[in-house]
């Protein structure tokens, strides 16, 4: 199990309930400016989730989610590789690679499977053209955000990994939101893991003549467990993403009547 630190527990449940995060309230009251120079830190953490200046927190959260996935694969007897992941030329012409290789899973006509993880925030926090969208839902249907991210990852990686020279790979996007919603492809992977774990369990107990009902019951238990384990890992990751490092802050926000072409819409050129 992934350990909860007291401040992470507090941060996650404040975000779940939609109330200000205690560690961010003082920064918001002081008007502390993010290192991006475009926004002040809000007490709900929406900008921190959205701004690329907080990549340290984002990377820690990303690794936490991968840790949870690797633990589930281990329980199912699936070996994984997190280093030296093959790279491909993405659809946008840039070189990229997935996050984790699942070895010898034999899916979609390929021996190995590569997954790429993403954790979407459902609220705006980095809008400049219309700042009223910050703190509001990014889409009326949150599932659209998951679908858009998954489609982007599939377009970038699936064909490249399937048609590369040498060893080819299947590809699955593993996308979920900070509220805990999971994209269908992520659930598909968790079902595959639950199925493999069930097969392994009956093999370990030496039961080669189990009924279909017994198999489905055990698989249902493991599927529930995999979803709960990923939900727990995601909760810890969400709390980690809302953390503010000292180097990501600037000076307190200046009085509204002061002129600062970098920070305030009133002085930003119309084409910004």
PLM regions and their residue ranges:
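Short, conserved catalytic/metal-binding micro-motifs enriched in Asp/Glu and His
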Residues: 45-51, 99, 115, 173
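Non-catalytic C-terminal interaction segments of nucleic acid-processing enzymes
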Residues: 1-32, 37, 57, 71, ...
């Amino acid at each position: 199990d992934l350990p909860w630190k007291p401040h992470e527990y507090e941060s996650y449940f404040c975000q779940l309930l939609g109330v200000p995060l205690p560690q961010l309230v003082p920064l918001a009251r002081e008007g502390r400016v993010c290192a991006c120079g475009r926004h002040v830190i809000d007490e709900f953490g929406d900008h921190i989730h959205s701004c690329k200046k907080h990549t340290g927190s984002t990377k820690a959260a990303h690794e936490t989610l991968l840790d949870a996935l690797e633990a589930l694969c281990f329980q199912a007897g699936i070996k994984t590789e997190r280093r030296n992941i093959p790279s491909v030329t993405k659809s946008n012409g840039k070189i990229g690679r997935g996050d984790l290789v699942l070895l010898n899973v034999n899916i979609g006509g390929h021996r190995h499977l590569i997954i790429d993880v993403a954790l979407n925030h459902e609220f705006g926090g980095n809008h400049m053209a219309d700042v009223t969208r910050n703190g509001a839902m990014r889409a009326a249907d949150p599932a659209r955000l998951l679908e858009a991210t998954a489609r982007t990852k599939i377009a970038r990686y699936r064909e490249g990994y399937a048609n590369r020279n040498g060893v080819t790979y299947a590809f699955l996007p593993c996308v979920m939101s900070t509220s805990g919603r999971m994209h269908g492809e992520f659930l598909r992977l968790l079902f595959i893991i639950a199925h493999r774990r069930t097969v392994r369990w009956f093999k370990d107990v030496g039961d080669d003549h189990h009924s279909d009902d017994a198999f489905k019951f055990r698989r249902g238990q493991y599927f529930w467990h995999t979803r709960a384990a990923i939900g727990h890992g995601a909760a810890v990751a969400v709390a980690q993403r809302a953390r503010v490092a000292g180097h990501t802050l600037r000076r307190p926000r200046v009085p509204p009547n002061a002129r600062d072409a970098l920070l305030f819409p009133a002085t930003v050129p119309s084409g910004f």
